[in-house]
């Protein structure tokens, strides 16, 4: 009986040490996936601006997923085509950024000369600690509080923290 108590105590100690490390590793993986998602959005916006709406950017993820006439492939994968998209513990959004009306795209959708994309943890402190955002300048910014940096913070001289 005593041996069983010792074994249970040892297992409990191992779990007490390993579970927090596992949670930190999972949050780090979620944050890396969120960064990857925002980079994907930035790349899709660059392709969209060059091919579908010269100088204009989509303001909805669904617009990026819509192929131009004569093509069967959109600019972003279907798993990121829902506004907002939920991936790996983060909510990915695309919204109008600072800019003015751009040209209509190949499908007749309105565009802007700027966009604002964000990745915010579903549950700050559980699914991720940091939030991320990007604009048409394609620089990712980070906020350690779990709230995405604002458009104003990401403007030149706005005081935002670029992701290193």
Residue spans for each PLM region:
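N-terminal single-pass transmembrane signal-anchor helix
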Residues: 1-22
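Extracellular/periplasmic head regions of type IV pilus-like filament subunits
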Residues: 40-130, 134-139, 144, 157-164
């Amino acid at each position: 009986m005593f041996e069983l108590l010792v074994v249970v105590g040892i297992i409990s100690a191992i779990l007490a040490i390993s579970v927090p490390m596992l949670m930190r590793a999972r949050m780090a993986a979620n944050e890396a996936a969120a960064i990857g998602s925002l980079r994907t959005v930035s790349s899709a916006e660059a392709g969209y601006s060059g091919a579908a709406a010269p100088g204009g950017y989509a303001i909805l993820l669904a617009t990026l997923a819509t192929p131009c006439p004569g093509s069967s492939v959109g600019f972003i994968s279907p798993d990121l085509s829902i506004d907002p998209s939920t991936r790996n513990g983060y909510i990915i959004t695309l919204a109008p950024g600072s800019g003015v009306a751009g040209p209509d795209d190949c499908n007749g959708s309105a565009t802007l000369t700027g966009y604002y994309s964000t990745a915010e943890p579903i549950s700050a402190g559980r699914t991720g600690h940091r939030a991320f955002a990007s604009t048409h300048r394609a620089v990712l910014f980070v906020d350690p509080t779990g709230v995405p940096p604002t458009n104003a913070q990401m403007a030149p001289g706005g005081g935002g923290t670029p992701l290193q």
